[in-house]
Curated annotation (Swiss-Prot):
Protein name, as recorded: Nicotinate-nucleotide--dimethylbenzimidazole phosphoribosyltransferase
Pfam families xrefs: DBI_PRT
Catalytic residues in the record: 318 (proton acceptor)
Organism expressing this protein natively: Escherichia coli (strain SMS-3-5 / SECEC)
HAMAP family xrefs: CobT
GO molecular function: nicotinate-nucleotide-dimethylbenzimidazole phosphoribosyltransferase activity
E.C. numbers: 2.4.2.21
Pathway field: Nucleoside biosynthesis; alpha-ribazole biosynthesis; alpha-ribazole from 5,6-dimethylbenzimidazole: step 1/2
Family: Belongs to the CobT family.
Keywords: Cobalamin biosynthesis, Glycosyltransferase, Transferase
Role this protein plays: Catalyzes the synthesis of alpha-ribazole-5'-phosphate from nicotinate mononucleotide (NAMN) and 5,6-dimethylbenzimidazole (DMB).
This protein's record includes keyword Transferase: yes
Gene: cobT
Keyword Transferase: yes
Record text on subunit structure and interactions: Homodimer.
Length: 359
């Protein structure tokens, strides 16, 4: 059986030759050069992904939602009861949550995965990858052992690769877990080197008079656990959570197949920061869907070097932003594959070149 290190070493580089061919093709389409803006750049990025074989296209679409509880909830960093995690996970199996509705609109399947919900028995209808009944309280102990983090990463990577074998070419990540913006902020603070007060936000409507406590909890977690910012697994194990580990696994798994993965909001940025520490080669496969309204979002995205496509003032999580952005990926593929070419028309535009997919 492959180890985590083995799988990380399989992540292919983006193909610059394929991107150059795509650039020439797009410049020769029936439009002024660059007039479709970031849609053109996105199509070129997709063309460079080996899993798409040089031609931007979308097959099956999947949003993987990682569900877990967090011991740090006990510190009063969230106003929602912890039981909401399990209740909302059940609602996802019925297709009634935000991500389910948006994914259905986009023609994507939602995979609801229990990686650490705090219930006595597994919840029917969920994919069971549960490691434990919630992570440790990061204010007083590590979130999990390194072994637990590595095993979950490996399990999710393998599951993601199986979905790719079955025709999924576009992945989205999502999460569900009360209090999970606290470990996410701890990860962002650790890896970016920014102070907790710069990255800790209100999450799911935390009253502002409780924000100081949340900031203090993040600071205590980092001081106590001393995560190594250069070691993504160490950061996830010490101040993360099972849902964050799971999302990182999806990113690594998709990238190992040479396929794109749409980020969601703040939680996914934190997971991406950790995943990129494990393998910087995954970064070109990460596509930022939207700008989260959570404080610290810009800091995390800036560190990743990513600019989101949408700014809808969203902070639901669940993978809702990833699902919402899937039609943008399809639009980039459509202009690449379906637009006419200047060479076949009577139009001559300064700066345009003849399309050539074979040179």
């Amino acid at each position: 059986m492959q180890t985590l290190a083995d799988l990380l070493n399989t992540i292919p580089a983006i193909d610059p030759a394929a991107m150059s061919r795509a650039q020439r093709h797009i410049d020769g389409l029936l439009k002024p050069v660059g007039s479709l803006g970031r849609l053109e750049a996105l199509a070129i990025q997709l063309a460079g992904m080996p899993g798409l074989n040089g031609i931007p296209h979308v097959g099956k679409k999947a949003v993987l939602v990682m569900c877990a509880d967090h011991g740090v909830w006990e510190e009063g960093v969230a106003i929602s009861p912890k039981e909401v995690t399990a209740i909302q996970a059940e609602n996802m199996t019925r297709g009634t949550t935000g991500v389910c509705v948006l994914a259905a609109q986009a023609g994507a399947n939602v995979y609801v995965i229990d990686v650490g919900i705090d219930t006595a028995e597994p919840i029917p209808g969920l994919i069971n990858m549960r490691v434990a009944r919630g992570s440790g309280n990061i204010a007083s102990a590590p979130a999990m052992s390194r072994h637990q983090a590595e095993k979950l990463l490996l399990d999710v990577i393998c599951y993601t690769r199986e979905l790719a074998k079955n025709g999924v070419t576009l992945f989205g990540v999502g999460e569900l877990g009360m209090a999970n913006t606290t470990p996410a902020a701890a990860i962002v603070s650790t890896i970016t080197g920014r102070a907790p007060e710069e990255v800790v936000g209100i999450g799911a409507n935390l009253p502002t008079d409780k924000l100081a406590n949340k900031i203090d909890v993040v600071r205590r977690a980092i001081t106590l656990n001393q995560p190594n910012p250069q070691d993504g697994v160490d950061v996830l194990a010490k101040v993360g959570g099972f849902d964050l580990v799971g999302m990182a696994g999806v990113m690594l798994g998709a990238a190992s197949c040479g396929l794109p993965v749409l980020l969601d909001g703040f939680l996914s940025y934190a997971a991406a920061l950790a995943a990129c520490q494990m393998s910087p080669a995954i970064k070109p496969y990460l596509i930022p869907s939207h700008l989260s309204a959570e404080k610290g979002a810009r800091i995390a995205l800036s560190h990743l070097g990513l600019e989101p496509f949408l700014n809808m003032e969203m902070r639901l999580g669940e993978g809702s932003g990833a699902a919402l952005a899937m039609p943008i990926i399809e639009a980039a593929c459509a202009i690449y594959n379906n637009m006419g070419e200047l060479a076949a028309s009577n139009i001559v535009l300064p700066g345009n070149t003849t399309s050539d997919l074979n040179s």
